Amino acid sequence: MSLVAIGINHKTATVDLREKVAFSPDKIHDAMKSLAKCTKTGEAVIISTCNRTELYTNTGDEAEVIRWFEEYHQLSHEEVEPCLYKFEGQGVVKHLMRVSSGLDSLILGEPQILGQVKQSFAKAREAGSVAITMDRLFQNTFSVAKKVRTETEIGAAAVSVAFAAVSMAKHIFSSISSTKVLLIGAGETIELVARHLKDNGVDSMVVANRTLSRAEGMCDEFGATAITLEQIPDFLPKADIVISSTASPLPILGKGMVEKALKQRRHQPMLLVDIAVPRDIEAEVADLDDAFLYTVDDLQSIIEQNMASRREAAEQAEVIAENESHLFMEWVRSLESVDSIREYRTQSMAIKDELVERAINKLAQGGDSEQLLLELANKLTNKLIHAPTQALTAASRQGDLNSIGQLRSALGLDKN
């Protein structure tokens, strides 16, 4: 058997096609069982996220895996084939290690994908579609992803606006977990900011939004307080950090409002991060002594520097993935050799048992023991040397000196 993987991701397919080939969480368990039945080893793992759908199997039949994929999603070969990428053997191992380490992600080095791969593997275990090879492959991959995180700086620098905003706050405040944060807006970016803040131990968050119900929905997840935009002046004086991202055409925070809040704070410093376009916070706020205002342009320059750092770290990570994939394939080959040795020994023992049984029967019938012993030795020798003799003859006819040399070495003909 050999490892085979096929997939579609953000680089090869449109959102429309990615949606069509995605596996819903409630159906992926049965899908893995179904795919596993198509393989001779019964091993299959499916990874399905918003940016990729990938099938990992331990089978030698790539065409069968592709056929199953197309039939499951009721798509034609013409729709799928142009967007499909395929890997075999070591290519599968290296690709999975790259994916799990964030080297193949939309945002280079993003850590979320490792958790998604782990969830997929756990579901495959539940479905019973994992055996020795897939188990070893994924466990090794998780170790490699951890190694990439600890031995390179691929995850150290912020490369998203939301992450960069929180990273900046961490640099300014010695203990971000004890700060009070006001978030303005309730869109995807602010939700991501809230998640990063929560991960860094921030418990005191207020979310201000034009639509209160939208803010309340987000606050339920993060244990925050929801308010309307009109209530901002009441909550602003309590905020150590303000991060804003709305679609408002006009500024939400003016210099006067911030100045008044700073007076009430007795001029304790306030960090304001405006990641909206157009701006949510008037530029003049930066003129206030105790206000530290950063815009999306400031963050973008940080992100560009950090992305360069990540690309450098990614080169180191690629070397790790390459080396580790080689080591895994050595284990696979050793597994194959163990199976071959076991099969060869079983076959040889069966030949021996058959010939010995015949000799015993003839001996019981009064046969000459010396003659039977000689006959047994000759027949056993002929049976055991038959396959190597055929291999040597075939290699000789083809002029395959390399195979002849290997066979001579294996048979011990070159000793002494």
From Swiss-Prot:
Residues at the catalytic site: C50 (nucleophile)
Site (Important for activity): H95
Top enzyme category: oxidoreductase
Pathway assigned in UniProt: Porphyrin-containing compound metabolism; protoporphyrin-IX biosynthesis; 5-aminolevulinate from L-glutamyl-tRNA(Glu): step 1/2
Reactions listed under catalytic activity: (S)-4-amino-5-oxopentanoate + tRNA(Glu) + NADP(+) = L-glutamyl-tRNA(Glu) + NADPH + H(+)
EC number(s) from the headed UniProt entry: 1.2.1.70
Positions bound to NADP(+): G185, A186, G187, E188, T189, I190
Molecular function in Gene Ontology: glutamyl-tRNA reductase activity; NADP binding
Keywords from the UniProt entry: NADP, Oxidoreductase, Porphyrin biosynthesis
SUPFAM superfamilies, per database record: Glutamyl tRNA-reductase catalytic, N-terminal domain, Glutamyl tRNA-reductase dimerization domain, NAD(P)-binding Rossmann-fold domains
BP term (GO), one: protoporphyrinogen IX biosynthetic process from glutamate
Superkingdom assignment: Bacteria
Pfam families: GlutR_dimer, GlutR_N, Shikimate_DH
Residue sites binding substrate per the record: T49, C50, N51, R52, S105, E110, P111, Q112, Q116
UniProt record similarity statement: Belongs to the glutamyl-tRNA reductase family.
Misc. remarks from the entry: During catalysis, the active site Cys acts as a nucleophile attacking the alpha-carbonyl group of tRNA-bound glutamate with the formation of a thioester intermediate between enzyme and glutamate, and the concomitant release of tRNA(Glu). The thioester intermediate is finally reduced by direct hydride transfer from NADPH, to form the product GSA.
Role, per record: Catalyzes the NADPH-dependent reduction of glutamyl-tRNA(Glu) to glutamate 1-semialdehyde (GSA).
Record remark on domains: Possesses an unusual extended V-shaped dimeric structure with each monomer consisting of three distinct domains arranged along a curved 'spinal' alpha-helix. The N-terminal catalytic domain specifically recognizes the glutamate moiety of the substrate. The second domain is the NADPH-binding domain, and the third C-terminal domain is responsible for dimerization.
Oligomer and partners: Homodimer.
Name listed for the protein in its UniProt record: Glutamyl-tRNA reductase
Organism name: Shewanella woodyi (strain ATCC 51908 / MS32)
